[in-house]
Regions:
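C-terminal and late-domain segments of enzyme folds
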Residues: 46-48, 52-134
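Class I SAM-dependent methyltransferase SAM-binding "motif I" and its flanking Rossmann-like core
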Residues: 2-3, 10-75
């Protein structure tokens, strides 16, 4: 799933036969990748960086919210990133993924690339090379 507008991606794919087939294939072992907005759309909620509200995501991984380009957005739009973090659902983990960085889920979550992955759960921030998700 490519970048662009995560809300548009979620609206277009939600509750469609295509999305159901994608989820089934993923559960059966197919690879699935989300870049930028695509990664945001996979969560249960989409945190508004461009928009100031939270929107329903596709729910593939319902208890995460993603902010891609975290290091860039934090420099460009610090007030919006801070507001997004404050609006974060208390029951979810927020993944702030820096530029040139990927998070891959196999048996565990792993970080690849030159940047960091900022994991905010509750009031704590974790950032590790290899981190357990649960």
């Amino acid at each position: 799933f490519s970048g662009g507008d995560p809300v548009h991606l979620a609206e277009v794919f939600a509750d469609t036969p295509m999305w159901k087939a994608i989820v089934q294939a993923w559960h059966e072992g197919a690879s699935l990748a989300g870049c930028s907005a695509g990664a945001m759309a996979f969560g249960g909620k989409i945190i508004g960086i461009r928009r100031s509200h939270i929107t329903e995501g596709l729910g593939l991984i319902p208890d995460i919210e993603v902010i891609p380009h975290y290091d860039k957005f934090l420099g460009w739009l610090p007030d919006r990133v801070t507001a997004a973090i404050v609006r974060k659902d208390a029951n979810t983990a927020l993944l702030g993924i820096d530029e040139n960085t990927a998070v891959v889920l196999t048996d565990q979550w792993r970080k690849y690339g030159t940047g960091k992955v900022h994991v905010l759960r509750g009031e704590f921030e974790l950032s590790e090379e290899l981190f357990p998700y649960n």
